[in-house]
Amino acid sequence: MATPTESEFAAPIPQTNPGSYEELHRKARDVFPTCFEGAKLMVNKGLSSHFQVSHTLSLSAMNTGYRFGATYVGTNQVGPAEAYPILLGDTDVNGNTTATILHQMGIYRTKLQGQIQQGKLAGAQATIERKGRLSTLGLTLANIDLVNEAGILVGQFLRRLTPRLDVGTEMVYQYGKNIPGGQISVLSYAARYTANHFIAAATLGASGVHLTYYHKQHDNLAFGVEFECNANVGEAVTTLAYQTELPEEGVTMRASFDTNWSVGGVFEKRLSQQLPFTLALSGTLNHVKAAGKFGIGLIIG
């Protein structure tokens, strides 16, 4: 295996790079609403051009409390709106903390994630990617426990075959004493086709099928369709979503419904052109279970 050269740590990522394997379905998923329940107040405050903090107060039956978050963006500019390193973190009053560190050195990109729950390390993950001219190679180590001999290893490869077609593969390997046989591995394959106004992506493996379709009708209207089939439990769900924007009115609406007869939506309205106040309304309804949830939020900053 060739060792990285000094020029590779300084070279920019080529424009023809297909991106990360984990972002295959991201474009369609961005259309889907992120619904919430209860009342939420979020205040974002930029302390400098590189440092920002946030305060979030939530009131709901499932989650009531306060969270503090901080974001730092470094000075290493690698794109028009992309700079590294990036440090993200948030914590609540009980000390439950999540943190993420992102850094890019030339064609190499690293990501470190950690989570602390009730004073104990609940999860840790490290990822490194090599982004070449036409391909991305990634390796992830998750929850590696040297004492109990357990952990998860994920290898990913994404290759650009034509300007519109990308193909890839992923291998997930998990080992541990609580796994039948001591270890298990799952291999899956993926493809993505990008056209002028739509993106279609597919992931196929022994555990199931994941299909997404993104369609941009025009600048302010987009649709997303997702099909997920889990072969292990014998379930399949299809979800249709849309996102529409009215920039002049400061309005963004996202909504979705699926084959389980669940409907959800998030409506966001900028209250003032001079002040950074945004009102968010969220609602979900399952017609089969006759269960619904409602949320209201105010975002400042």
Swiss-Prot record:
Q: How does it sit in the membrane?
A: Multi-pass membrane protein
Mark the transmembrane ranges.
Answer: none
Q: Which UniProt keywords apply?
A: Ion transport, Membrane, Mitochondrion, Mitochondrion outer membrane, Porin, Protein transport, Transmembrane, Transmembrane beta strand, Transport
Report the main location listed first in the record.
mitochondrion
Q: Which family does it belong to?
A: Belongs to the Tom40 family.
Q: What exactly does this protein do?
A: Channel-forming protein essential for import of protein precursors into mitochondria. Specifically required for nnt-1 accumulation in the mitochondria and may be involved in the secretion of daf-28/insulin from the mitochondria. Required for embryonic and larval development.
> What GO terms fall under cellular component here?
mitochondrial outer membrane translocase complex; pore complex
**Oligomer and partners:** Forms part of the preprotein translocase complex of the outer mitochondrial membrane (TOM complex). Interacts with mitochondrial targeting sequences.
Where is region (Disordered) located? 1-20
Subcellular location field: Mitochondrion outer membrane
GO process terms (BP):
monoatomic ion transport; protein import into mitochondrial matrix; protein targeting to mitochondrion
Q: What is this protein called?
A: Mitochondrial import receptor subunit TOM40 homolog
Q: Domain of life of the organism in this record? A: Eukaryota
GO terms for MF: porin activity; protein transmembrane transporter activity
